Amino acid sequence: MGSEPPSSPQVVEEGADEEDEELSGAEDADLRSSSGRGSLLTRRGITLRVLLKDGLVEPGDGVLSIHYLGKKFVGDLLNDGKIRWVETGQIFNSPSAWATHCKRLVNPAKKSGCGWASVRYRGQKLVQYKTTWLHKYQPSADMSLISEGEDDEMGDDDEEEGKTTIPVEDKNKKSKPELHEIGLTQRRDRERIPVRYCTLGTRDAARDPHTLVELSAFSAINRFQPFNVAVSSNVLLLMDFHCHLTSSEVVGYLGGRWDTNTQLLTVLRAFPCRTRLADKDAAPAVEEEICQNLFMRGLSLVGWYHSHPRGPALPSLQDIDSQMDHQLRLQGSSNGFQPCLGIICGPYYHGNQGVASTITPFWVVPPPEQRPNDHGIPVAVEVTYVQDNFLTTDVLNEMMLLVEFYRSAPDLVQFSQMWSPNTSILDKIKASLSGHAPKDQAYAQILEHVYNQLRNTQ
């Protein structure tokens, strides 16, 4: 997009962004599910017009800014919620459109708009004002306002590159050690001591976004858990298997159903993302495939998972912001309020009890209304785990696809190496997955075929 002189402003439509269209996938396809329209990465959300209407922000000259790879861009917030870039006078319909345009000027390879996480209003990220809006209006928000047409992405930070799926911790690390070096990294993992939420205070740009935060209990903040959760054992088995395959972080989505009458969220299926976090080109196809799988099975998008390969299964500050952003997106569903479950899996942390992975379901409560610049509060979610009758063909096929995907990966785990003096890594995986076994004991023979494939990858 070329620059226009101030006397002839160019209006950049939000929908004109090729990158936003790529990432949104089936944006106009109604999945007939409580997750509403849009792909798994983007969906209709709160707009600047909504924040202006409700008094959370005010129009003004030079109140918006983007800091990206050492460059600063300044914009005016107009009365109608549009953005005028001060340097050229161009008009943009959304933060995503402006952010994408500016970032492409600095880095032409940039593939994604990321306005709400990158654009700042009076020095504070716009996503923080979304959080304040959610706190005031959840769960009885005006759905017509929520769907006014902002597409944004899950938490693309100002200075960081290389993500294609939902934001995860350590996304900007250029390389990670092989698992056989895990003994060398054990001491470093333990030095990442989680902090208590009460010690965080107001957001501080100087604080490491990878800082881990202990989970609070709903009762500790004088709340009741506003929904019940049931998770299928097959979901845990596939997720745990996925997280064990590589020494790098992985991500995936959770499909299920939300019953507004019983306030029960049932997680029935895991959908691993078979793509590298830095592979921008492959992400849209992977997202579209998962979107179609959800639709064909009559499931809704109900959450996401990611791994902390060698660290505690606790959310980082970055994870907290990502989870809050996900919750905002599902807030705009056709059923009104719908929870979005976050799960962190820690497969190779030596602080785990025994050989089993630590699996942590969590949710984020918006900060107190009088402290809108605080981080959201990460809370532990009580979950009922439901043992499936048998291992489904879907799960088995997905496991085999994952083996093939990571077969030649440089960070593939060395399964024959030792996890402990008496336990190989493959034996550790078997033991961890046995904790998610179905009732039908024939599953062990079925999984042995998968384990043989793992042996053949070395």
UniProtKB/Swiss-Prot annotation:
Its EC number is 3.4.-.-. Residues 42-137 form the RAMA domain. Zn(2+) binds at H306, H308, D319. Residues 1-37, 147-175 are annotated as: Disordered. GO terms for biological process: double-strand break repair; proteolysis. Degraded following binding to N(6)-methyladenosine methylated DNA (m6A). It is an enzyme of class 3 (hydrolase). A motif (JAMM motif) lies at residues 306-319. InterPro entries: JAMM/MPN+_dom, JAMM_MPN+_peptidase_M67A, MPN, RAMA. One of its GO terms (cellular component) is BRCA1-A complex. DNA binds at S94, S96, W116. Residues 229-364 form the MPN domain. Residues 14-28, 148-161 have a biased composition (Acidic residues). One of its GO terms (molecular function) is metal ion binding. CDD domains: MPN_2A_DUB. Keywords: Hydrolase, Metal-binding, Metalloprotease, Protease, Zinc. Probable protease. Acts as a sensor of N(6)-methyladenosine methylation on DNA (m6A): recognizes and binds m6A DNA, leading to its degradation. Binds only double strand DNA (dsDNA) in a sequence-independent manner. Belongs to the peptidase M67 family. This is MPN domain-containing protein. It comes from Danio rerio. The gene is mpnd.
